[in-house]
Structure formats: C-alpha cells, structure tokens
C-alpha cells in the first residue's frame, strides 16, 4: 500500500509541477486558474461523485454511510479540541491561535483528498472520500466561517444559501443514492464517468498554478508552519488511525478515511484568513507549505497507518 501511495503521490506531484511550470511561463494566470476551479468544483467534482455512487461500491449498507460521515465530523471536532491546548502553550495571539487550530483540524478533502483517494482506491475511494464533503462543509460553516467573522450582525440566511453549491448538492444526492440503491446507467453514466476523469489532473494543475505565484522560499523559513504541517499531515491522521483500529471496520475504509484526514491544510483557511484579516500571512503560508511537503508526509503517514490498522 505505501508503495502504491508513493507512486500515486509522485504522479500527482508531477501534474502539480506541470501546473507550476504553466503558471511560471505565464500560460495560465490567476484568472485562468480561477476558471479551472469553477469547472472543477461545479462540474467535474459533482460528476465524479455521482458516477462513483453509481458503481458497484454504491451497494454499501446505508448504516455504514452514516457511521463514516459521523467519523469524519467527529475527527474534525476532535482535532480542533486537541490543538487548542497546544496553541495556549505556544502563547499565540488570538488570530494566530484561530488560524493554527483550524489549519490543523481541517484537511483539504476536496482538491487533494478525493483525487488522491480515487487514484489509490478507485471508485470505492471516490465514494469514501466524497462522504467527507457534507461533513467538511458543516464544519466550515460552524467552526470556520463563524469563528473568522469579526462582525456579529451577519446574514445567516445568506451564509446558509452559500452552502448550496453543486458539490454539496451532489454529495447529498450520493447519500440518497446509497440509501435507495438507485444508480445512473447507460449513456448518463458514461457522460458522468467521462467528466469525472478530469478531476485528478485539473485539481493538481490548479494547485500547481497557485503555487507558482507564491514565495516558496519564505514558506520554508517559518518554524510554526512546520509544526502545523506536522500536526495536520502526520499526527492528527495517525491519532484517527488508532481510533479507527477499534471500530472493526473494513481496513480499506479506515485507510481511505485516514488518507483524507492526512491531506494538506484546506485552502478555505487561506481564503477566510485573508477575507477577514485573521493572520492572513500565516493562513496562506500554512496552506502553501503543507502542499509543498505533501509528497513526503502522505506516503510516510500512510506507511505508519498501515501498520496501525
């Protein structure tokens, strides 16, 4: 398994490097990367999720679906609680503490997690990784969006409306399909599957393009960023692996969950850090460094997780 993960991570890193070169050469600018992001989040990801739910693995018991979703949500909350004492020990300022705890708790399950699970575990991995989507969205709303906002008179209705994205809707539809046993077949399934093939390369190209416009050297000079990456990509997912060992679940299911939980810092941390002026430099650089070191941390983490599980 570790060798397979390393091979897939290297392939994804090569795709990321291609995006980096395209960005450096000016072939894809920020506007182009934003357009690719829209296609990925609003078209390719939803098609990928629905196609996966229509596969053979869509026959999993619905009770197991609920348990896996609860496991994701529980881990997000547990990671948040575990990092708060660490932030206090480090005597971080309020904004730094907020970014620190949320960076460690919230993995990039979308851009990195689902493509990586798909590459390593196939259709089964897509389904298991996609079950993190509604949980991650709920966590983002309750623990990130509400925490990062400074003003108290915000429009709750508008915030709830912002959660109605194609990706979230498709994740809910996937859960309904798993509960009812209904599947796409024939031409519709072929269409969804064809569009789904664009997920992995597109997501890696986007990350590479975004990295090309960032100060990479500066990111490697901050000790606090290494601690965030260590906790986010190694310590927290391995804690989850120890807990999952006692669930009695299928080993592949546990490994896939751990893989999602071991991904780099979610890009939304940088977005909200900049938008609400909550330690924006730390937020952006934590996302950047964890992505840069992912080709090292992910294979190492999965190598250890295999032995735990």
Language-model regions, residue ranges each:
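Alpha-helical transmembrane segments of multi-pass small-molecule/ion transporters
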Residues: 1-309
């Amino acid at each position: 398994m570790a060798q397979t993960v390393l091979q897939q991570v290297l392939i994804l890193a090569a795709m990321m490097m291609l995006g980096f070169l395209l960005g450096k050469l000016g072939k894809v600018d920020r506007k182009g990367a934003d357009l690719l992001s829209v296609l990925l989040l609003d078209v390719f990801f939803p098609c990928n999720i629905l196609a996966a739910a229509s596969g053979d693995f869509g026959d999993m018991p619905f009770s197991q679906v609920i348990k896996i979703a609860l496991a994701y949500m529980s881990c997000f909350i547990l990671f948040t609680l575990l990092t708060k004492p660490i932030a206090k020990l480090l005597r971080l300022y309020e904004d730094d503490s907020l970014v620190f705890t949320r960076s460690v708790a919230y993995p990039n399950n979308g851009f990195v997690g689902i493509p990586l699970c798909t590459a390593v575990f196939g259709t089964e991995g897509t389904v298991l990784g996609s079950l993190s989507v509604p949980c991650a969205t709920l966590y983002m709303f309750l623990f990130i969006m509400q925490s990062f906002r400074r003003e108290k008179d915000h429009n709750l209705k508008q915030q709830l409306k912002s959660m109605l994205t194609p990706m979230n809707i498709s994740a809910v539809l996937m859960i309904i399909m798993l509960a009812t046993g209904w599947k796409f077949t024939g031409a519709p399934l072929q269409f969804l599957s064809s569009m789904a093939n664009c997920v992995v390369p597109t997501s890696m190209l986007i990350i590479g393009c975004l990295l090309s416009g960032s100060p990479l050297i500066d990111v490697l000079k901050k000790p606090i960023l290494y601690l965030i990456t260590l906790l986010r990509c190694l310590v927290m997912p391995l804690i989850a692996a120890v807990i999952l060992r006692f669930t009695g679940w299928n080993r592949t299911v546990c490994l896939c969950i751990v893989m999602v939980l071991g991904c780099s810092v979610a890009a939304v941390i940088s977005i909200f850090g900049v938008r609400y002026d909550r330690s924006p430099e730390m937020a952006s650089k934590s996302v950047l460094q964890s992505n840069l070191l992912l080709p090292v941390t992910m294979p190492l983490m999965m190598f250890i997780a295999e032995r735990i599980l």
